[in-house]
Amino acid sequence: MTELIDRPPQVDQPPSPTAELLRVRGLHVAFGERAAVRGVDFALGAGESLGIVGESGSGKSTTALALLRMLPAGGRITGGAVELDGQDLAALPEEALRAVRGKRIAMVFQDPMSSLNPVLSVGRQLDEALRAHGGRRPKAERAAQAVELLELVGVPKAADRLGDFPHRFSGGQRQRIMIALALAHDAQVLVADEPTTALDPTVQRQILRLLARINRERGTALVVISHDLGVIAETCARLLVMRDGEVVEQGPTARLLTDPRHSYTKSLLAAVPRLDAPSRAAANSTPGAEPLLVVRGLAKAYGPRRRRSPALESVDLDLHPGETLGLVGESGSGKSTLARALVGAHPPDAGTVTFAGQPLDGRRARREVQLVFQDPYASLNPRLTVGRIIAEPLIAHRLGDRAQRQARVAELLEQVGLEASAAARSPREFSGGQRQRIGIARALAPEPSVLVCDEPVSALDVSIQAQVIELLARLQRELGLAVLFIAHDLAVVRQVSHRIAVLHRGRIVESGPADRVVTAPEHPYTAELLAAVPSLPTPTSGSLI
């Protein structure tokens, strides 16, 4: 099973022409009076693959949901057709649609934890899916098919895991289970909406190869929705680019990625960080000679005393003023545990952290070392105004009176590229990129010397990523900040970092200059991470101009 999953997808050899299986004609979708999708057209045959890309608000996920008529409340198809084998799903009565949805066309959602039922075992959920369209087959037969499905998608020891609940599986395994549920009835069309967004590079590669294998070997038509052009390059033979609800360009993936015609496609490609591009950190700032933050022998474990699971083991790190140190590793490697230890949120079990030669205690850590969170939506309290959110560290550390804090908030908003008037507004009124700027302003409020950025751009579109990265670089230049930049995207990490440290199972297995670590890795794990990064073909000369 593993050999099949790890075989690279062959998207450079599109399948031979087939009769149209899925045909979307002039699709229009609206939420109230707001048009979300306007005039989308495409066709897909058995064994063919189509990637739909675009930034947040482009309409790509709405298009995917419309294919199965699973639009959220208030959404409706206002025009066009979605034809599956000539049958218009957009016009079907709900009862007839239920017989098609899940059986002939199925969906894999972005977040398996919110899509899987947390109080039902995986075996029970597969059994329900098999019963929904499979008639009255014996329970033992359904259980055997559930095991076959889990084995097909590469879940180890499938027969032993039917009784396990979703939280007992890793993120990658949960996504495999979602794919197994979608395949329960040999669906002719599989729609995958951002199937690897939250996954690390090696797990992402496994899921992409699994989808490509299903597409190739089972003849399932595959639609992949993503904001990541590298994901589409690895998986889909054809590409459709959306912006503001409309298709701006479509065609063979290889052609669009090397010779795009539309200015928007060109701008998307130009914003994608490339692993082969050298670090830009040295041109931005020069680190100080003496380390500012020194970590020695840091250890942290979780769980009951007799069965404690180590999250960090003997971690050593140095961080200099004006330096960006990139920290990479998969989920469970200890990256976020280290971040929480440095800001004083989780005291380590062993080891020391010193700041400017002095032990870094909890209160000092909470002022000198500030955290920028991954999720710009969950990390801002929706009940507070932006001004109050940014002022929270000032209030906590009793810095300034009310008027001084208001002045500091206005200064910080302008520093991160927002209007001072934003202070009176709610976080709900801002985009993801703007919310991340607010989060950065909050982190800067008590004038820290160190920023710990925990996946600060992973939830953002590529063009917004580039803007936030440039903002962090400018702030580092102006304020002399030391930055610990935690991420799983090695291309982004190389771009922003002076040095890179690789964390694996709680230990630093390699560290060194960013360009050297990427081009000449010394540890097998680093090489494995690098090999898993989706690659884009090189654009033809002048094609992005």
Regions found by a protein language model. Give the residues of each.
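ABC ATPase "signature
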Residues: V247-G251, D259, I508-G512
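ABC ATPase NBD coupling module
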Residues: L89-A106, R124, A132, A254-P260, ...
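Conserved ABC ATPase signature
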Residues: D164-F169, Q173, S426-F430, Q434
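Helix-to-loop junction immediately C-terminal to a conserved catalytic motif
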Residues: L68, P72, V343
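Conserved ABC transporter NBD signature motif
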Residues: R76-D88, G351-D361, A365, E510
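ABC ATPase C-loop
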Residues: I177, A182-L183, I438, L444
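Conserved ABC ATPase "signature" region
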Residues: D88, E141-D160, Q404-S421, A531
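A short, proline-enriched helix->beta-strand linker immediately N-terminal to the Walker B motif
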Residues: A184-Q188, A445-S449
